[in-house]
Amino acid sequence: MPMDIQKIREYLPHRYPFLLVDRVVEVGENNIVGYKNVSINEEFFQGHFPDYPIMPGVLIVEALAQISGILGFIMNNETPKPGSLFLFAGAEKVRFKKQVVAGDQLVLKAELVMQKRGIYKYNCTATVDGKVATTAEIIVSHLRTEQA
């Protein structure tokens, strides 16, 4: 079930400059693969770092959390609606192994390892050109308000 940016916007409440998933290319029963195209025009490159632009690691982790949230909706056979969100609840075992720079395509992968009472834990990897840039265990929480 590939998703273009319009479909992704249905699943995530994030908008520019914090929407960090450009496309979903693969969805399995418990896993998802997508990507973020990293452009020199990203706002964060103005300050991180002007003479040596590197994508901030925390934004790579956020991109992994966003793709994990999309998978949470899909695994629940739920389409997003007002009052239903997957929120970034935590990150464990985060490791940064390779710099991500302008022009890179960051491949984002998440695989479910645990689900309990609305809490989901995913093993996540971000790669560039087949080389691991970041690994993390991402935790998201399914929030349902009265509107849902």
UniProtKB/Swiss-Prot annotation:
Q: Which GO terms describe its biological process?
A: fatty acid biosynthetic process; lipid A biosynthetic process
- The enzyme's main class, written as a single word, is lyase
| Protein keywords | Cytoplasm, Lipid A biosynthesis, Lipid biosynthesis, Lipid metabolism, Lyase
Cellular-component GO terms for this entry:
cytoplasm; membrane
On the tree of life, the source organism's domain of life is Bacteria
Source organism of this protein record: Acinetobacter baylyi (strain ATCC 33305 / BD413 / ADP1)
Write down the CDD domains for this protein, in alphabetical order.
FabZ (cd01288)
Q: Where is it chiefly localized?
A: cytoplasm
NCBIfam families xref list? fabZ, PRK00006.1
Gene symbol of the encoding locus: fabZ
**Function, in words:** Involved in unsaturated fatty acids biosynthesis. Catalyzes the dehydration of short chain beta-hydroxyacyl-ACPs and long chain saturated and unsaturated beta-hydroxyacyl-ACPs.
Residues annotated as catalytic? H48
Name of this chain's protein: 3-hydroxyacyl-[acyl-carrier-protein] dehydratase FabZ
